[in-house]
């Protein structure tokens, strides 16, 4: 079942690029969270998306928001990608695909790659409630950053 606006966000723990566990409910104690699901590390649009969030860090910090980038890549690949692009947010490995299933963002076939993440963003408030959701069927498109920021500003 897909996670929808107004529903409780499925909690999860995933390993970050440094092989450290990151739990959504723990992150929410610090402020709202943007979950940024992406098809693949090092791909063009995914890099543009994460670098856009990176470059918005000051604005997001003012809203006490944390961005968590999530792909099905290994934490080894995510660590190399984070370093190569000088990213400041945690990148999480959903290698076993449990979280993309819980959020309903599994792409069954993208140019021959099976069961990777669709490009999707969720804004989760500090109570764990989903306040914004955007799932893109075309992975070449970027999320609507303005709507993400508007959802955060409304909290």
Across the structure, where does each feature detected by a protein language model lie?
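Chalcogenol-based redox active-site neighborhoods
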Residues: 1-155
């Amino acid at each position: 079942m897909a996670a929808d606006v107004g529903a409780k966000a499925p909690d999860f723990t995933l390993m970050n690029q440094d092989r450290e566990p990151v739990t959504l409910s723990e992150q929410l104690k610090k402020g709202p969270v943007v979950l940024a699901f992406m098809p693949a590390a090092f791909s063009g649009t995914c890099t543009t998306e994460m670098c856009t969030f990176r470059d918005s860090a000051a604005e997001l910090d003012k809203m006490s928001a944390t961005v968590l980038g999530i792909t099905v890549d290994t934490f080894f690949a995510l660590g190399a990608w984070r370093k190569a692009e000088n990213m400041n947010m945690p990148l999480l490995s959903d290698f076993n695909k449990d979280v993309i299933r819980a959020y309903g963002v599994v792409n069954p076939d993208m140019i021959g790659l099976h069961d990777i993440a669709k490009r999707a963003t969720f804004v989760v408030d500090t109570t764990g409630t989903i306040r914004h959701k955007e799932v893109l069927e075309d992975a070449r498109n970027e999320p609507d950053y303005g709507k993400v920021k508007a959802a955060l500003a409304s909290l």
